[in-house]
């Protein structure tokens, strides 16, 4: 199921994001070359992984705070990709040139399935944006309980079809 859950989850969160920013959906519909960048911007804006848990393997000090070996740390992926210190603008913009996001982790903890998730999602965004003109909520979405990973359980939408 690696890659499949991420793709399903990220597409659901992506549709929710495009509903919130309809001008960006129009931008994607009008310029398919933005699909890959749109996926990265969706991961930056609303990643499926909201935090990762790590354990300190040695004592260290970070920004004046002492962290003891064995301490459990929760690293907020969402904030790392939206912090104005690291990003020029927190605004959702699928045409923006951004620094690398951490939606798939980093270093030795980088998701091995990220190529699959990205390629599948870009293909899906291209297909969906080709035939879905206007997307809106049809009812309230329900999300997984807050657990470090998130995804719509239900996402009732309605849309105009472009044939």
Question: Language-model segments: which ranges?
Answer:
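Cytochrome P450
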Residues: 1-163
